[in-house]
Amino acid sequence: MIKVTGYAAKHSYSRLKPYEFERDEAGAHEVEIDVLYCGVCHSDIHQVKNEWSNTVYPCVPGHEIVGRVTKVGPAVTRHAVGDLVGVGCMIDSCGQCEACKEGDQNYCGSPNSWLATYNGPMNPRAKAGGENIYGRDNTFGGYSNVLVVKEDFVLKIPAALRPEVAAPILCAGVTTWSPLRRWGVKAGDQVGVIGMGGLGHMAAKLARALGAEVTLFTTTPEKIEEAQKLGFKAVLEKDKQAFEKLEKSFDFILSTVPEKHDLNPFVALLKQDSVLAVVGALEPLAPLDNMSMAQMRRSVAGSLIGNLAETQDVLDFCAEHNIGPEIEMIRIQDVNDAYKKVEKGEVRFRYVIDMASLKEEIAGA
């Protein structure tokens, strides 16, 4: 067994604190990773606070992980000691269902769904034969110094990407990339992005690199200014005049807002046969005006993270096009304060934990 130190929440109202636990040694098809960086995702906060009612405690968050391979199992062929690698939201799936066979591990149809990098199976209450099919009820994520992961769920970090910049691409990047590719965004398309946070600004950068014309929708003048600094057109959500001018203008709209909000004003902006995809909010949204949708044959759809191939694809695309998230580096000791700032929308645009700060804490203990 490997002795590991991480930061964990013990219950829904607790601060993240140092937590010691053990991981299994790398098996035949697994790699051991020295964690270098881990992004802070809004879903980390949702899970720590049990806002989706599926958290298993103790909860060690973190699924935007970049590190270096330190050991490999005897059957590993995809990675070698010394490789710079990444781990995103998943560390396993059943591999047998139709979705998995098609390469869509993120839509695994097994009773437990896919195995999350932290907080156990995506559906921890489902049982197959009385037990979770993965043989475990909890998993611990990247807010820790060591990770052990099945080689197929480990991504290669391109040399052209700074490792700390690569970390958020493993969730925020692929979560926005997957719907952009699924609905065929291409050069010349008019694309709207709702929200100017960690996901929103990445979606805008990726869509622009695909050749689309991008408009960001946000809620404050400050965020309008931020969007313009990044070279994007931006519209205040409360500007009714601007919305009227933009009716039937967009080929695709992506909503990245991580909470309940009204999509109806944005549906009216879609052209005929166009799609508004939601990636930010997993809770119920405001009711949709089906008349507006039916009259123009518009669609509202959902999308959940991305599969492994899409994750490697977006990493490579970002490296090729020199794209990356805007990040702020923090020490792990400051993660609780970082959570508060994320909730207030004060981060520009993604916090990344320098895990050297955890190693310094361990060494000084």
Give, region by region, the residue ranges found by the protein language model.
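NAD(P)H dinucleotide-binding glycine-rich loop of Rossmann-like/cofactor-binding domains
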Residues: 94-194
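Glycine-rich beta-strand-centered segment in the early N-terminal region that forms part
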Residues: 24-38, 51-101, 105-106, 114, ...
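C-terminal hydrophobic helical "lid"/dimerization subdomain
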Residues: 1-2, 209, 308-365
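Helix-to-beta-strand junctions that scaffold the AdoMet/dcAdoMet cofactor pocket
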Residues: 270-271
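Adenosine-nucleotide cofactor-binding segment
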Residues: 187-196, 201, 205-263
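Short, well-ordered coil/turn residues at beta-beta hairpins
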Residues: 37, 88, 254-256, 355
